[in-house]
C-alpha cells in the first residue's frame, strides 16, 4: 500500500498528461496522481473533454493546461521566495500564516487522496484556498520584482503578465467552445 501511495504521488509520466482532460476509465488510463488530476480538474472539471472542441482547435485546451501548470509552479516558487524575502507589504508572520494554511490544506488533500483512492477524491474543490494563496503570493512576488531594478525581475514580471493574459484568453476560448457545444 505504501509503495502504491508513493507511486501515485511521485509518478509524473507522460502517459498522464498525454490527454489533458480527466480520465475516468475507458480512455488511455484512469487518473491516479493527485497533483495532475487536481490541475486537470481545476481547468476542465469532471465533464469537459475533447468532444467539446473542434479538431482544429485542440491546441486550445492543451495550451491552457500547460500555461496553468507553469503558473502553478511559479505561484509555488513565489510563495517560497516571498516567505523568506523581506517585503514592505506583508510581515513575516502574515506570510508564514499563509504558507502554513497552504501546507495544511495541501497536506490534508494528499492524505485524503491516499486514504480514499478514487478519481472524484482528487477534485480541485478541496483545495481552492491554495489557489487564492498562490494568487496572493504571485501578487507579492510581482510587487517585489517591480520594486527591483534588476533585469531578471523585469523579465519575470513581463513573463507573468504574458502568461496570465494567455491563460485568460485561452480560458475564454475554452468555455466559449463548451458553451457552444452545450447550446
Predicted regions, residues:
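Lumenal/periplasmic acceptor-binding loop at the mouth of the active site in multi-pass
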Residues: 2-79, 83, 94-102
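Signature aromatic-anchored transmembrane alpha helix within multi-pass, membrane-resident enzymes
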Residues: 145-182
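Membrane-interface catalytic loops of GT-C/OST-like multi-pass glycosylation enzymes that act
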Residues: 109-128, 179-182
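Membrane-interface junctions at the ends of membrane-embedded or membrane-associated helices
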Residues: 80-90, 135-160
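Alpha-helical transmembrane segments of integral membrane proteins
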Residues: 93-101, 127, 131, 157-159
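Hydrophobic/aromatic-rich transmembrane helices and adjacent perimembrane loops
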Residues: 121-142
Amino acid at each position: 500500500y505504501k509503495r502504491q501511495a508513493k507511486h501515485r504521488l511521485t509518478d509524473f509520466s507522460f502517459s498522464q498528461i498525454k490527454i489533458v482532460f480527466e480520465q475516468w476509465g475507458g480512455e488511455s488510463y484512469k487518473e491516479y496522481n493527485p497533483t495532475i488530476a487536481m490541475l486537470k480538474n481545476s481547468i476542465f472539471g469532471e465533464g469537459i473533454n475533447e468532444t467539446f472542441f473542434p479538431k482544429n482547435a485542440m491546441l486550445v485546451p492543451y495550451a491552457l493546461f500547460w500555461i496553468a501548470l507553469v503558473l502553478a509552479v511559479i505561484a509555488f516558487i513565489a510563495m517560497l521566495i516571498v516567505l523568506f524575502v523581506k517585503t514592505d507589504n506583508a510581515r513575516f508572520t502574515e506570510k508564514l500564516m499563509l504558507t502554513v494554511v497552504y501546507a495544511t490544506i495541501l497536506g490534508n488533500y494528499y492524505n485524503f487522496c491516499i486514504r480514499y483512492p478514487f478519481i472524484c477524491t482528487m477534485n480541485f474543490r478541496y483545495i481552492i484556498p491554495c489557489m487564492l494563496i498562490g494568487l496572493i503570493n504571485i501578487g507579492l512576488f510581482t510587487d517585489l520584482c517591480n520594486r527591483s531594478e534588476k533585469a531578471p525581475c523585469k523579465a519575470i514580471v513581463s513573463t507573468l503578465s504574458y502568461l496570465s493574459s494567455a491563460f485568460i484568453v485561452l480560458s475564454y476560448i475554452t468555455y466559449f467552445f463548451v458553451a457552444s457545444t452545450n447550446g
